[in-house]
């Protein structure tokens, strides 16, 4: 499945499957960290979270659920900058929350409008980690 040029390499699992005539169900892709094959459920979740394929030495990789959560937590611990309420996030970015893609700090899923609203109405902070604002999705809330 090696590709010739970086510009022609698919950046999503959907595009990868389309280019190679596969379905997410029968896609065999390894985790970038642990090198285990993703299960069908993990491949669907990776696609649903709109995460990108990582290319290494001409081969595509994704991230299994365990490694994605583990390395997200490591990243949060190492690169946490600050926390702020929604109005500060809007003020700093110059964009309304609904115009921004804010991912869950744990599972990396883009937060839905209702998940962003949960932060607003319940006084929850967003966290600035690695130069981007993150929050917590419904499944990963403490």
Curated annotation (Swiss-Prot):
Q: What is the superkingdom listed in this entry's lineage? A: Viruses
Give the subcellular location: Host cytoplasm; Host nucleus
Give GO terms: molecular function aspect only.
DNA binding; zinc ion binding
Please report the organism this UniProt entry assigns to the protein. Answer: Human papillomavirus type 32
User: Cross-referenced InterPro entries, in alphabetical order?
Assistant: E6, E6_sf
Q: Which UniProt keywords apply?
A: Activator, DNA-binding, Early protein, Host cytoplasm, Host nucleus, Host-virus interaction, Inhibition of host innate immune response by virus, Metal-binding, Modulation of host cell apoptosis by virus, Transcription, Transcription regulation, Viral immunoevasion, Zinc, Zinc-finger
Zinc finger region(s), unnamed: 31-67, 104-140
Q: Might you name a Gene Ontology BP term for this protein?
A: DNA-templated transcription
Family (UniProt): Belongs to the papillomaviridae E6 protein family.
Q: What does this protein do?
A: Plays a major role in the induction and maintenance of cellular transformation. E6 associates with host UBE3A/E6-AP ubiquitin-protein ligase and modulates its activity. Sequesters tumor suppressor TP53 in the host cytoplasm and modulates its activity by interacting with host EP300 that results in the reduction of TP53 acetylation and activation. In turn, apoptosis induced by DNA damage is inhibited. E6 also protects host keratinocytes from apoptosis by mediating the degradation of host BAK1. May also inhibit host immune response.
GO CC terms, sorted: host cell cytoplasm; host cell nucleus
Disulfide-bonded cysteines: none
Q: How does it assemble?
A: Forms homodimers. Interacts with ubiquitin-protein ligase UBE3A/E6-AP; this interaction stimulates UBE3A ubiquitin activity. Interacts with host TP53 and EP300; this interaction inhibits TP53 activity.
Q: What else is known?
A: Belongs to the low risk human alphapapillomavirus family. The cancer-causing human papillomavirus E6 protein has a unique carboxy terminal PDZ domain containing substrate but low risk E6s do not possess this domain.
Can you say what this protein is called? Protein E6
Q: Pfam families given for it?
A: E6
């Amino acid at each position: 499945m090696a590709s010739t040029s970086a510009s022609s390499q698919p950046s999503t699992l959907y595009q990868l499957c389309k280019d190679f005539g596969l379905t997410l169900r029968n896609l065999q892709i390894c985790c970038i960290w642990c090198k285990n094959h993703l299960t069908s459920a993990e491949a669907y979740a990776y696609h649903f979270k709109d995460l990108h394929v990582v290319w290494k030495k001409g081969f595509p990789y994704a991230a299994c659920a365990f490694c994605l959560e583990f390395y997200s937590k490591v990243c949060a611990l190492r690169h946490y900058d600050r926390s702020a309420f929604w109005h500060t996030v809007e003020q700093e970015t110059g964009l309304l929350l609904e115009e921004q893609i804010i991912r869950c700090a744990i599972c990396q899923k883009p937060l839905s409008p209702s998940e962003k609203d949960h932060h607003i109405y319940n006084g929850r902070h967003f966290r600035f980690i690695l130069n981007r604002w993150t929050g917590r999705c419904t499944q990963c809330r403490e």
